[in-house]
Amino acid sequence: MWSSIAALPVLVPVALACLGYEGGVPTPTAHYSNSAVIEVAAGQVFDAGWAKYDRGSGACNDQSEGDWKDAVFYLHSGATLKNVIIGANQAEGVHCDGPCTLQFVWFEDVCEDAITIKNDKAGQETWIIGGGAYHASDKIVQHNGCGTVNIINFYAEDYGKVYRSCGNCDNQCKRNVYVEGTTARDGGEVVGINLNYGDTATLKNVCADADHPCVFYDGCAGDCEPKKVGYCSG
């Protein structure tokens, strides 16, 4: 399905170009397995030069919920991570404490979530530009903060959701997501947002084979389960 979808409001899908790179995960220039998370300071840039990073054999705990200490990279507010491959041996991929920028970050096999964004405020923006993720049985991008996430020219294959606004965070809020030029194959939802909290989603130039690329939920706060309540577009 080639689509341009916005919610709210919803636009009629049209055929447009998508630019997610479909040539597979780049060949790494080096491989590093680290026993601890790599922290990138606020406002700093970490350019991996196309090396692969992971946390060593057995790091993935089969969907056990982890925190930032289980991640491969932990980005403080305003930090940038670029030109890197996150290997399969990890429980969490990248955690952002506040808005961050990811440029050409690839995930060869997602364990729990590839990217988790938290503590961003309304009006702050996170950018995920290029790159892609494979084999994310649950979510690629988990958004727990209250800002806007922009996903541009991304590639996803074999996934549950490309983006999910947190369904049951203790402190809920309105979140926004913008997806453009992205390719999503063999998966579920491109975006899942909470209708009852006023979330917004815009999908432009997205190529996806999902029956319903944009899905509405009723979110909740705390120890509860959000409920699927409809679709942003047919």
Curated annotation (Swiss-Prot):
<keyword id="KW-0732">Signal</keyword>
<dbReference type="GO" id="GO:0030570">
    <property type="term" value="F:pectate lyase activity"/>
</dbReference>
<dbReference type="GO" id="GO:0071555">
    <property type="term" value="P:cell wall organization"/>
</dbReference>
<keyword id="KW-0106">Calcium</keyword>
<keyword id="KW-0961">Cell wall biogenesis/degradation</keyword>
<dbReference type="Pfam" id="PF03211">
    <property type="entry name" value="Pectate_lyase"/>
</dbReference>
<dbReference type="GO" id="GO:0005576">
    <property type="term" value="C:extracellular region"/>
</dbReference>
<keyword id="KW-0624">Polysaccharide degradation</keyword>
<keyword id="KW-0964">Secreted</keyword>
<dbReference type="InterPro" id="IPR011050">
    <property type="entry name" value="Pectin_lyase_fold/virulence"/>
</dbReference>
<dbReference type="GO" id="GO:0045490">
    <property type="term" value="P:pectin catabolic process"/>
</dbReference>
<dbReference type="InterPro" id="IPR012334">
    <property type="entry name" value="Pectin_lyas_fold"/>
</dbReference>
<dbReference type="InterPro" id="IPR004898">
    <property type="entry name" value="Pectate_lyase_PlyH/PlyE-like"/>
</dbReference>
<protein>
    <recommendedName>
        <fullName>Probable pectate lyase F</fullName>
        <ecNumber>4.2.2.2</ecNumber>
    </recommendedName>
</protein>
<comment type="function">
    <text>Pectinolytic enzyme consist of four classes of enzymes: pectin lyase, polygalacturonase, pectin methylesterase and rhamnogalacturonase. Among pectinolytic enzymes, pectin lyase is the most important in depolymerization of pectin, since it cleaves internal glycosidic bonds of highly methylated pectins. Favors pectate, the anion, over pectin, the methyl ester.</text>
</comment>
<keyword id="KW-0456">Lyase</keyword>
<feature type="signal peptide">
    <location>
        <begin position="1"/>
        <end position="17"/>
    </location>
</feature>
<comment type="similarity">
    <text>Belongs to the polysaccharide lyase 3 family.</text>
</comment>
<keyword id="KW-0119">Carbohydrate metabolism</keyword>
